[in-house]
């Protein structure tokens, strides 16, 4: 897929970027690829990655997706883009919604415009379950980001830049997520702070997140949205699983929901399920390719579609305590923390 091609990863020093590079290095894909450009604004993280990976095929570009000129110049000669740069912390975005808009919406506009301008072959835009039925600023900004990508995809002719979207559930042990928080609390002998015990979240590994993006990259058509089917757990079961794994007796304290949190998350809305393709491990939601000339639909009508149940962390496969423990023990992060416990 990547032979003699140049790939750019925006926000490439984050959890996803590190997971992709780990996959490429272990699988040997890095040997076939021409160049991987890491585009991000944190010079310290770039330097850490440069030293840790020490691979001549990695090229580092300091810049911000909010600045069109910096992303446009860095994208010259790029064949493919994985757009992972984002503000993703829900409470932070609640307090600074314009910052979420500037990065997640306007920043994405810059990335997509630069990709089209530089005749990039395909762009995969990384979104989130919080973009479905959004109630918080982060989810709203990501929902608008998706709409922006699909609108641009709708205007592309055959042979032009292909724009696809992937939606994640909760990526376990990613930066700023709850698993590192619980493990730190366990190690420090503190109470485990749970917002709401019955709250459910999808459980997706960083390996799964890379699989999803590569699947979309290989199979995606213009304007497609891809979702990976994932199991879920309540937050209380997740905390108890970590207690068992680390042989912890820490107390659990319920603190109530944080700003902008939902009781459960949705990956596919009921309206989207009506047109989604079930691809066994994934759902593909095709783009609505209709234009603004709706007259023909009033005259000819439109076939009726069944309203299906949405795909949520409440109605997906629910893992019990032992299943969650088994899943957590597959994570490199958890294994490393156990070694250092």
Curated annotation (Swiss-Prot):
InterPro entries: CapD_C, NAD(P)-bd_dom_sf, Polysac_CapD-like, Polysaccharide_Synthase-Rel. Keywords: Isomerase, Lipopolysaccharide biosynthesis. One of its GO terms (molecular function) is UDP-glucose 4-epimerase activity. Pfam families: Polysacc_syn_2C, Polysacc_synt_2. Its EC number is 5.1.3.2. GO terms for biological process: lipopolysaccharide biosynthetic process. It catalyses: UDP-alpha-D-glucose = UDP-alpha-D-galactose. The keyword Isomerase applies. This is UDP-glucose 4-epimerase. It comes from Rickettsia rickettsii (strain Sheila Smith).
């Amino acid at each position: 897929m990547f032979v003699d091609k140049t790939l750019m990863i925006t926000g490439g020093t984050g959890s996803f970027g590190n997971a992709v590079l780990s996959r490429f290095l272990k699988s040997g894909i890095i040997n076939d690829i021409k160049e991987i450009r890491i585009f991000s604004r944190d010079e310290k993280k770039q330097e850490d990655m440069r030293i840790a990976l020490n691979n001549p095929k990695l090229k580092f570009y300091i810049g911000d997706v909010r600045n069109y000129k910096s992303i446009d110049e860095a994208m010259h000669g790029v064949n493919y883009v994985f757009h992972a740069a984002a503000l993703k912390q829900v409470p932070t975005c609640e307090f600074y919604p314009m910052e979420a808009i500037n990065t997640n919406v306007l920043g994405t506009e810059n990335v997509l415009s630069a990709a089209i301008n530089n005749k990039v072959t395909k762009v995969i835009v990384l979104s989130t379950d919080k973009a479905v039925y959004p109630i918080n600023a982060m989810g709203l900004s990501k929902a608008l980001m998706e709409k922006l990508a699909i609108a641009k995809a709708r205007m592309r002719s055959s042979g032009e830049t292909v724009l696809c979207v992937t939606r994640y559930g909760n990526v376990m042990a990613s930066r700023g997520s709850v698993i590192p928080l619980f493990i730190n609390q366990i190690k420090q002998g503190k109470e485990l702070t749970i917002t709401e015990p019955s709250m459910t979240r999808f459980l997706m590994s960083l390996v799964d997140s890379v699989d999803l993006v590569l699947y979309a990259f290989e199979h995606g058509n213009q304007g497609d949205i891809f979702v990976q089917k994932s199991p879920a757990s309540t937050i209380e079961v997740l905390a108890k699983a970590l207690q068992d794994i680390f042989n912890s007796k820490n107390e659990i304290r319920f603190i109530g929901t944080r700003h902008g949190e939902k009781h459960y998350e949705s990956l596919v809305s009921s309206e989207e399920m009506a047109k989604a393709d079930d691809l066994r491990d994934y759902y593909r939601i095709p783009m609505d390719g209709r234009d603004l000339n709706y007259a023909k639909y009033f005259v000819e009508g439109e076939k009726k579609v069944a309203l299906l149940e949405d795909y949520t962390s409440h109605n997906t496969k629910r893992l019990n305590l032992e299943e969650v423990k088994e899943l957590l023990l597959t994570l490199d992060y958890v294994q490393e923390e156990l070694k250092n416990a």
